[in-house]
Amino acid sequence: MALYGIYGSHTTESCPLNNIQSRKIVLNTVKDFDNIANKNRIKILEQYHSALEHTFIWIVDTENAHSIERFMIDSGWAAFNAVKIVPLGRYQNVIEACKKLGT
């Protein structure tokens, strides 16, 4: 398993706070969200949203980016969000790599 960041954004017009279709997706999906995640072998660690910026970042643990792609489609979030999937590492790993490289 590996850590990934799911960075997403949508327009003001497609925001679930403003758009009834997007809101329906969010409210309908919330009932099965954990099941959809489990089906795609994803463990959701954190979810952060900036409502007025219309952006979000979710931190997940999964085997590969393809699982995330399928999860975003299955959950409906890909219907109104542009999504970027980014592999993540812990900051401490950067520090250790710098120490090994020296100055």
Q: What are the residue ranges of the model-derived segments?
A:
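Short S/T/G/P-rich N-terminal loop/turn motif that feeds into the first structured element of a domain
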Residues: 1-54, 63-67, 88-103
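Conserved RNP beta-strands of RNA recognition motif
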Residues: 58-59
